[in-house]
Amino acid sequence: MRKDRQNKITEVGIYLKGLQNRLCRAFEKEEGESRFQETLWEKPNGGGGRTRLLTEGHVIEQGGVNFSCVYGNQLPPAATQKHPEISGFAFQAEGLSLVIHPRNPYVPTVHANFRFFIAGKDEADPRWWFGGGYDLTPYYGFEEDCRHWHRVAKKACDRFGEAIYPRFKAACDDYFYLKHRNEPRGIGGLFFDDLNEWEFKRCFEFIKILGDSFLEAYLPIMQNRKNHPYGERQREFQLYRRGRYVEFNLLYDRGTRFGLEFGGRTESILMSLPPRVVWRPNWEPEPGSEEARLYEDYLVRRNWVSVSGA
């Protein structure tokens, strides 16, 4: 059983590192000249990772694509919040995390994460599960972009049953929600945790299909909007809305909490934060403006794949 456990870790790791390579190449192609800078890190007796960060690009103001493979004698609290019965178990975890903060305010910020855990006190019967998904955070809304994003997500999910997309879309809407602001972080996407309801091979296949669908979902949006004209007003609104991203990641994000509780590399954990951000107390958008439309038409729960969008 120990060999089977290690085979799972190896198989998932090979896929995630390959996906990291593909994602970085695709974004570097959009940039033209800027490149991701790689940092290899290790945690003594705890694993390590491969952090790739692109800064001050023409299209991407800051973006990170990170891979990590870590292990320990006890799962951090963030990993056992929903399952206290496995608290104290030894574990191994692998994950790929991506956050892209574009320069142009008309290009949405995007996040993706794919992770695998295996834990147990008994080597003969370890617990394993997958988690992850992807979500989109626009600053200026375009109906066609939102529909494209969700239709690609649905197409990937539908191979595993028609109930999967609505379930994981609803979970995404629930998770990426700022309770203290009473608003969602963006227009959502997919989110799932503790996925082990199928056999390992099928669960892993689901992860691979989602991972492979990410560029299809996001790149056309980036390509269509990266040269959209903008001015100081749009840039200031982008920086203001980025504040919500910071608030969510520091207050609610379980991945951030897991990394900090585990004692991972802080710079890699916090690469999700935007490089520039502003807060404006009591700010309200001008009625009828593009900024107001974001709140009225996009930062609401919607069925983006239906004809009406209701």
Swiss-Prot record:
Enzyme type, top EC level: oxidoreductase
Gene field: hemF
Quaternary structure, from the entry: Homodimer.
Compartment list: Cytoplasm
Catalysed conversion reaction: coproporphyrinogen III + O2 + 2 H(+) = protoporphyrinogen IX + 2 CO2 + 2 H2O
Alphabetical UniProt keywords: Cytoplasm, Heme biosynthesis, Metal-binding, Oxidoreductase, Porphyrin biosynthesis
Family to which this protein belongs: Belongs to the aerobic coproporphyrinogen-III oxidase family.
Binding-site list for substrate: 97, 113-115, 263-265
Amino acids binding a divalent metal cation: 101, 111, 150, 180
UniProt entry tagged with the keyword Cell membrane: no
Lineage: superkingdom: Bacteria
Role this protein plays: Involved in the heme biosynthesis. Catalyzes the aerobic oxidative decarboxylation of propionate groups of rings A and B of coproporphyrinogen-III to yield the vinyl groups in protoporphyrinogen-IX.
InterPro entries referenced in this protein's UniProt entry, alphabetically: Coprogen_oxidase_aer, Coprogen_oxidase_aer_sf, Coprogen_oxidase_CS
Cofactor requirements of the protein: a divalent metal cation
Name used for this protein in its record: Oxygen-dependent coproporphyrinogen-III oxidase
Gene Ontology BP terms: protoporphyrinogen IX biosynthetic process
Region (Important for dimerization): 245-280
Cellular component GO terms, alphabetical: cytoplasm
GO MF terms, alphabetically ordered: coproporphyrinogen oxidase activity; metal ion binding; protein homodimerization activity
UniProt pathway: Porphyrin-containing compound metabolism; protoporphyrin-IX biosynthesis; protoporphyrinogen-IX from coproporphyrinogen-III (O2 route): step 1/1
HAMAP family for this protein: Coprogen_oxidas
NCBIfam families, sorted: PRK05330.1
Pfam families referenced in this protein's UniProt entry, alphabetically: Coprogen_oxidas
